[in-house]
Structure formats: C-alpha cells, structure tokens
C-alpha cells in the first residue's frame, strides 16, 4: 500500500521546495485539500482518499520535512520548518492543483496550519476559498496539551539536525499508544506502524524530528491568533471529528471549542484515538462526502 501511494504521487517544485503531492479524482477547481499531522504524512490519508474515490478532487501533500518531501538537514526550525512556511506551501499546492475553493481537512500539527489558512481567509488574503473546514485531533489549544513521552524526549534536544537516525523500532513503538482500542485490536496496527515509520525515516527524516517538533513552541507564540480563529471563524462552516481516546489532543479540547463556538458541529469518535484517518477511514471519508455540497 505504501509503494502504491508513492507511485501515484509526484514530487513538485513549489515555492522553491520539493514537495510530494498526491492528487486524485476528477479534474476540478473545487476539491478537498488535506493537511496531515505529526509525525505522519500524506499516506495517513490513503484510506480516506480511496473511499472518496471519484466523488471529488482530493489533493494531499507531504509537508516540508515529512514523507517524500524535502528534508533539509542544514537549517534551523525558524528557517526551515515553521507552520507559517508550511501554510505558504499549502497555498502553493492549491494554486498548482488549480483549486479556487476547497473543503479543508486538517489534523494534528496540520490543524494549526489549517487555522493559519483560515485566519488568512478571515483577513481577506487567502488566494482560494475555504468553503468548509473539518479539523481533527490536534493540540492547537496548547495550554491543554498532554505530551507523549517521545515528544518530551525530542523537545529536549537542540535545534539542529541529528547526526544519526533515531532507532526505528523505538520510534515505531512510541507511536503505538496513540492508537485507539478498536484499531489496536484489528490486527492492522503493526503493519501501519511500520509504514508510518518508513515515511519518517525516508531520506534521513528521523534526524529532523526534534527540530520539527518545535512547532509546539510556535503554537504557544501564535496561541492568541489561532485560538481566536478556532473560536470565532465565521467565513465557512466548521466541523470537528475527534477521537475520544486521544491521549495527546484530549477530547476536552474539542469540548472547549464547542463551548466557545456553539454552532460548531462536533462528532466524538468512540474507540478512536489520535489517528481517525487511519483508524476509521471510511467514516471519515463519509463525513467529507456529506459536506461536499457545502456552499
């Protein structure tokens, strides 16, 4: 499945960065733009994309430093991996795909990138239109975050690329607790963890994981802007799909958004933890399909 996903996409030069882009479905200037999370990649969404099929144009790419996109080893976080830079690249992805309006889907770290794009729309400076936003399991409300042990270890490291790769098995096992009970019991978890780790370790990507994780510090710096957008976004409908068992982006975060913005649609996913697109891809895809006609 991983090899097929890679073969279906293409690495493009966007804003001067080599970015892996997977596009599917009928050609259209209206489509679904998906932003993945940390430490995932576009591959996390292959089940969702497959289930949507020919019902919509779907574009999902690997962020800089992730998956098959470029993973510079010679920069700092500020010069190479900021969420603002990632948002700029997603503008370029949409432009290159010919998208003028999108149903935006964003997860985890990508949730903050999505909120930056949403903030730009509210300010009238986004070059395409978000007509519906679906946000899922992410700790943009960083004052409520529950860091995983792997995250704590990586954050303690300096802002330079490591000289050696991380231990593959240790990294893989660090992801295991972030999956919910239903998926863990399905028999698919081990294969999924291997595929996810391969995406991280491709082209020495594990060496920049500690640098990229500094996005948590950027979230603190941008807390006012992105939380305000979360709570007051007016220019399109907002839907939250959230795993009840998420140990990092806890369900209380979704409850808080619902309290602050009561007209938000919130769907709590029982038995699901941090990776809804992997754990319940058909459910997630159906939620996207149901919102394709949003004005």
Feature-to-residue mapping (PLM):
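Flexible "cap/lid" subdomain of the alpha/beta-hydrolase fold that forms the substrate-access gate
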Residues: 1-8, 17-19, 39, 45, ...
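Short beta-strand element of the alpha/beta-hydrolase
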Residues: 29-36
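C-terminal alpha-helix
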Residues: 287-295
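Conserved hydrophobic "DFG−1" position in protein kinase catalytic cores
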Residues: 21-23
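Short amphipathic alpha-helix adjacent to the substrate-entry channel of hydrolases
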Residues: 44-60
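A short beta-loop-alpha structural element at the N-terminal edge
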Residues: 25-27
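Catalytic histidine-centered segment of alpha/beta-hydrolase-like enzymes
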Residues: 272-285
